[in-house]
Amino acid sequence: MSALLAHATQCLDTGRPAQAILALQEALRIAPGAAAIHHDLGFLCLQAGRLPEAIAALRSALTLDPSFAQASLCLGIALQGQGDTAGALAAYREAASLQPALTAAHVCLGALLESLGEQTLAIASFRSGAASGPASVWGRLSNARALVAENRDVEAEFVLRELVSLHPANAMGHEMLAMVFANGGRFEEARACYQRAIDAAPQLAGSYYDLTRCRRITRDDEALLSRMRSALVAPGLTADARLKVHLALGKALDDLGEPAAAMQHFDDADALRSSLVRFDTAAFEARVERLIDHFTPDLIARASDGGSSDATAVLIMGLPRSGTTLVEQILSSHPQAHGGGELPFWTVRGARWEEANVNGAKPALDFATLGAEYMGQLHALARQALRVTDKMPLNILWAGLIHLALPRATLIHCRRAGIDIATSIHRTYFNPYVSFPTGGAELVAAIRAVERLTAHWREVLPANRFIEVDYEQLACAPEPAIRRLIAACGLSWDEACLRPEHNPRVIKTPSKWQARQPIHRDAIESWRRYEPWLGPLAALVP
């Protein structure tokens, strides 16, 4: 037995993980009741990307030793890699409960909760992680994650600078510091940090994706392209990580004027995302029909009977990649407005309301209380601002519910050509837990369903509360479009709104680079360069 374990260690130390796995499998035939060996086998399979084998081995370890916190943590990572969100959450929580000092469990739990829109729970988990090991690498990362989630980026930068100073080979620290820089528009510093992260961990897929989105790739970047191609075929890369590398390579090849090769990578990324999360087109279309049927003109007309009287909220909504970040950047350039970013409030409340209705509960909502709860969160972001924005794009699903709770709020619908939206979505990384497709016939159907719902909102919501901004008009003739937008929000005119690229605020959305550029027309009809390779998306071509 000891010889087999020593051989496994030697294989691992010499870069032969497959042989190490074989040695551990042989050891388990001799000692099937050894929980530690099951854990080690699961851990190696996890590193090798062999997730089903990892899950089986880790579950065996936990069956033999239910108090094995590290096995529960690794199980959570493996389950998350396979798209089992509920299983991953349970495993992370169990690991953190079994061993509160296991900081990585708190960080993984917080990161997953954050991706699901559970911001308050995520911050609490990050805070627990930071408290469990404040001087450790994971503790510092956890503290930084909490600070970023609380929009305290300056403090997060200090924590991360200290981390990479103490641990210069820590790729996650460099990657997170790069993200803080990129969110603040400090792209040169971000690029340097992403490069350090890649140097430290050449398979760090997120750094490739974010680095390529911080600048245009040129023919001088052959070394970067070579590294990305190597990372793509490296063993152990999870489906989500491989997805990011495909998108990074697609962006790079797009910049280099190779749209056919770029589109192939975008298609491959979409296929991987589809393997992680299945989009149910029929269920989404049924949801849209239920919303249309429920929010009748008579119901909307009664909005003034309840809800909050607060007019502070400006909700910017529409399909993803329709220009919502640009509109928020314009509005938040006004001295009396504050950009709140993408807030998960209505995603969570809308889903709860919908679930209750579908289950036949038909809850009687207190719209004034609902509106007051939301406004409490909004005012906490900027208590002195006359207007505070919330630019969660798919709040478009809940426009009727929002109007009933906030009848004086301004709802801004960002409208853009469907085919340009589709090709932009197809090129962009979206968290697998965002329930929206990124390609194929599913994306076409989803866009058409949202457009159908939007047409309903256009008919039933008051015209002075549901304002529409056309991306193409905004890009081609910015000043008149911006003046109309500012007036519709009840703000006095300010010239700063014409120069949103100078707005220094933190931007956390995929458009953080584009939103820092002067308003331009380059993205109009951007689909044309992919025309021969559009596939099902061609159905959206006007």
Task: List each model region and its residues.
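PAPS-dependent sulfotransferases, especially Golgi type II membrane carbohydrate sulfotransferases
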Residues: 208-212, 225-236, 245-313, 368-382, ...
